[in-house]
Swiss-Prot record:
It comes from Arabidopsis thaliana (Mouse-ear cress). Induction: Up-regulated by pathogen infection and by abscisic acid. Its EC number is 1.11.1.-, 1.6.3.-. Residues 1-376, 483-516, 581-588, 756-921 are cytoplasmic. It is a multi-pass membrane protein. Residues 44-53 have a biased composition (Basic residues). This is Respiratory burst oxidase homolog protein D. The gene is RBOHD.
């Protein structure tokens, strides 16, 4: 057995334990005084000092002495341990004789790991040295006992890259070879050097490497560092020199990457790194990753690094110090071994199996499609069946009337289309009756068979049915019925005289009639409303001239949709003044529309009445980075809601008529209401402006760019009306023991309310009695959630200020680890890119020392780039086999397809079932 120790008994150590596969082997140990992890005394127990991968290279050469004189034919097991004051963790179990690699039998590896950790952690002694020695001896005996039961696997050569240090290399990868291979760089060189006599200018180095423009400064520093190392002078290089540069920065070995990184920091080439040089590279890395807060505090963070690596205040650090710091592997990686075997099995199972029989493939696809969409399917089949039945009924009815003799099948098609049109014009109002849907969702069990989450989508589907009905009805009349009536001879037209009077002689006769002009006006108004409601116009996705852009957007959608008030009035008139129907009870248009119109009108009146009798008073207003406005207001008496629901907000100072939906970010147990509103359109921009006028820069210790507290006095806050709450998909999270909450940008708002609700339920009896009594039916009753995974993906570092207090509160109160928080900042390059290496190092230092993340400013440690969603699902499936997981997503539609497909894939191929729910906004 060989173990390396630091200079202090408080230091954490990483040892190599070798036990021969024989119980006759004697236990020996030696202590080597290798170079310490830090420059200076290591009297401070700050962090584990991980073993350098280089120290393992000579282990096979010493196997005889370690084994107590055994021959070369013995097989050894190499175990990497992380020994701390009160615990021992196992990094890996490997074959060590003549080569390495993990044990071929994963079950044996896991058994060995559990045996060692149990044995080592149960061994105590008076001194650290004796404790360590006795632990390792005890572990050696346990190891031989385990291995004596099974045959030894084949011996393999030790591979340096399989050691624990390889985990640290993620912070030093410079360019991902899978996306930036040499052929692509070669082609870009030819293009960029065409006008400079075959030389690549340093100013174009970033472009040649395939970096984006934001990394231009970083690439320039990289160019300078490589030029100094290779004795290249000037600001231009040849293709041969570029190839040398490329080989150095794409070298996957640790030493090569570390040397390049050090060269970038050590600009004066004296082999030492000063605090000023560290600050400059921090500022450069922060700029490349759009981390403005870190860039502003570069000097403070440089001082933190120097404090860590230069405890003797020498004023500089050496490459050895930097190397040992970068070798710090996350503690989490040590503890992940328990699920590794199951994870590997799951990976094998998730590999797509190719079915040779096309019939079997199609049958599988159809089966899964039905299972995944049965709620939508039966609703769609019912709707299509009703439309088809109504069309057929009217078609047959008019085929047996006198009008058929003059106009033929045209009148049958027109009347069939009209019947479906009346039905759909009535039905389209129901999906937007929010109060009714919320009541059905909360008070009935219909949610198990009716997909209330798709109400807006069904509203759009019905709109397409209306378009089809208009085309059939108006098209058949204009292109077929009217021309036939005009062109018919006297004998043929005679049966129509009692309906139309004297035979029409032109189109104008039909247009000037009530039926004609009401129909034309309705078609024009519906065409305007439908067009501006499409995503291209409603979300301003089209590149239109500025004067046309003012006629699009949400405001245009909102106001033009109110044209349907005129449309419905004209539709009733149109249905009364029918040419071919004279008996009142056969004029059924008003019968179709009566109940839906009354229901929808009642909801609009209820909104106006409820918002006026339940006024709210502003408590606090804050303006955050990223153009986000936070409104905290009093909660009206009797306003009961569930986390995940939303409410409508109206501000008369902006527009007296517009109501906009926003997710509630406060929890049901809170004595206030809060919403977070991001500036995305005209209305939200004006709202932010009117509230910013009453705000001031925050005092010390408070977040936000601008802030105003209601307790400061009678501030002239603009009057705000609210209406709600209304049901939303996220409110169903309580149905699941385990939930995966995903928020993209401002889409985190409903998830924040859910997290706060979970926190309030964790407090239990400690909650204030008034809050508990006011919301007793919303909290503990029926609360099933026992584990929550929250993934918040945001583009800007400043976004983390929106919910900073909540994140810290969760970190402080969640002692049982019920909530697992993951913040992702996509402006930061992915882990493994050089532009993020120093940020990752700094993040680990700051979090270890102060418990605060340098990116988010909270106690929650942030991740870089975008999440690997497949790995997220895989992790949850491994940790919760046989469970049903609720997946709730809120954000832009770009991620919906990936998250939904992964939920379906894992549900089909594992015992863990994922139910995907998305928020519509």
């Amino acid at each position: 057995m060989k173990m390396r120790r630091g200079n202090s008994s408080n230091d954490h150590e990483l040892g190599i334990l070798r036990g021969a596969n024989s119980d006759t082997n004697s236990d020996t140990e030696s202590i080597a005084s290798d170079r310490g992890a830090f420059s200076g005394p290591l009297g401070r127990p700050k962090r584990a000092s991980k073993k350098n991968a280089r120290f393992a290279d000579d282990l096979p050469k010493r196997s005889n002495s370690v084994a107590g004189g055994r021959g070369d034919d013995d097989e050894y097991v190499e175990i990497t341990l992380d020994i701390r004051d009160d615990s021992v963790a196992v990094h890996s179990v490997q074959q060590a004789a003549g080569g390495g690699g993990h044990l071929e039998d994963p079950e044996l590896a896991l058994l060995t790991k559990k045996t060692l950790e149990s044995s080592l952690n149960n061994t105590t002694s008076l001194s650290f040295f004796r404790s360590t020695s006795s632990r390792i001896k005890n572990a050696s005996r346990e190891l031989r006992r385990v291995f004596s039961r099974r045959p030894s696997p084949a011996v393999r050569r030790f591979d340096r890259t399989s050691s624990a240090a390889i985990h640290a290399l993620k912070g030093l990868k410079f360019i991902a070879t899978k996306t930036a291979a040499w052929p692509a760089v070669d082609q870009r060189f030819d293009k960029l050097s065409a006008d400079s006599n075959g030389l690549l200018l340093s100013a174009k180095f970033w472009e040649c490497l395939g970096m984006n423009k934001e990394s231009k400064d970083f690439a320039d520093q990289l160019f300078r560092a490589l030029a100094r190392r290779n004795n290249v002078s000037g600001d231009a290089i040849t293709k041969e020199q570029l190839r040398i540069f490329w080989e150095q920065i794409s070298d996957e070995s640790f030493d090569a990457k570390l040397q390049v990184f050090f060269d970038m920091v050590d600009k004066d080439e004296d082999g030492r790194v000063t605090e000023e040089e560290v600050a400059e590279i921090i500022s450069l890395s922060a700029s490349a990753n759009k981390l403005s807060n870190i860039q502003k505090q570069a000097k403070e963070y440089a001082a933190l690094i120097m404090e860590e690596l230069d405890p003797d205040n020498a004023g500089f650090i050496m490459i050895e110090n930097l190397e040992m710091l970068l070798l710090q592997a996350p503690n989490q990686s040590v503890r992940m071994g328990d699920s590794r075997i199951l994870s590997q099995m799951l990976s094998q199972k998730l590999r797509p199996a190719k079915e040779s029989n096309p019939l079997v493939r199609w049958s599988e696809k159809i089966k899964y499609f039905i299972l995944d969409n049965w709620q939508r399917l039966w609703i769609m089949m019912l709707w299509l069946g009703i439309c088809g039945g109504l069309f057929t009924y009217k078609f047959i009815q008019y085929k047996n009337k006198a009008a058929y003799g003059v106009m033929g099948y045209c009148v049958c098609v027109a009347k069939g289309g009209a019947e479906t049109l009346k039905f759909n014009m009535a039905l389209i109002l129901l999906p937007v009756c929010r109060n009714t849907i919320t009541w059905l969702r909360n008070k009935t069990k219909l949610g198990t068979v009716v997909p209330f989450d798709d109400s807006l989508n069904f509203h759009k589907v019905i709109a397409s049915g209306i378009v089809v009905g208009v085309l059939l009805h108006a098209g058949a009349h204009l292109t077929c019925d009217f021309p036939r009536l005009i062109a018919a001879d006297e004998d043929t037209y005679e049966p129509m005289e009692k309906y139309f009077g004297d035979q029409p002689t032109s189109y104008w006769w039909f247009v000037k009639g009530v039926e004609g002009w009401t129909g034309i006006v309705m078609v024009v108004l519906m065409a305007i409303a439908f067009t501006l409601a499409t995503p291209w116009f409603r979300r301003n996705k089209l590149n239109l001239p500025n004067f046309l852009k003012k006629l699009t957007g949400f405001n245009a959608f909102w106001y033009t949709h109110h044209l349907f008030i005129i449309v419905y009035a004209l539709l009733i008139v149109h249905g009364i003044k029918l040419y071919l129907t004279k008996i009142w009870y056969q004029k059924t248009t008003w019968m179709y529309l009566a109940v839906p119109i009354l229901l929808y009108a009642s909801e609009r009146l209820l909104r106006a009445f409820r918002s006026s009798i339940k006024p709210v008073k502003m408590i606090k207003v804050a303006v955050y980075p990223g153009n986000v406005l936070s409104l905290h207001m009093t909660k009206p008496q009797g306003f009961k809601y569930k986390s995940g629901q939303f409410m409508l907000v109206n501000c008369r100072a902006v527009s007296p008529f517009e109501w906009h939906p926003f997710s509630i970010t406060s929890a049901p147990g809170d004595d206030y209401l809060s919403v977070h509103i991001r500036t995305l359109g005209d209305w939200t921009r004006k709202l932010r402006t009117v509230f910013s006028e009453v705000c001031k820069p925050p005092t010390a210790g408070k977040s936000g760019l601008l802030r105003a507290d209601g307790g400061d006095g009678n501030l002239p806050f603009p009057k705000v009306l609210i209406d709600g709450p209304y049901g939303a998909p996220a409110q169903d999270y309580k149905k699941y023991d385990v939930v995966l909450l995903v928020g993209l940008g401002i889409g985190a708002t409903p998830m924040i309310s859910i997290l706060k609700d979970i926190i309030n339920n964790m407090k239990g009896p400690d909650r204030d009695s008034d809050i508990e009594n006011n919301n007793s039916n919303n909290n503990s009753k029926g609360f099933k959630t026992r584990k929550a995974y929250f993934y918040w993906v945001t583009r800007e570092q400043g976004s983390f200020e929106w919910f900073k207090g909540i994140m810290d509160e969760i970190s402080e109160l969640d002692e049982e680890g019920i909530i697992e928080l993951h913040n992702y900042c996509t402006s930061v390059y992915e882990e493994g890119d050089a532009r993020v290496a120093l940020i990752a190092m700094l993040q680990s230092l700051q979090h270890a020392k102060n418990g605060v993340d340098v990116v988010s400013g909270t106690r929650v440690k942030s991740h870089f780039a975008k999440p690997n969603w497949r790995q997220v699902y895989k992790k949850i499936a491994v940790q919760h086999p046989g469970k049903r997981i609720g997946v709730f997503y809120c954000g832009m539609p770009g991620m919906i397809k990936e998250l939904k497909n992964l939920a379906l894939d894992f549900s089909r191929k594992t015992t863990t079932k994922f139910d995907f729910h998305k928020e519509n906004f």
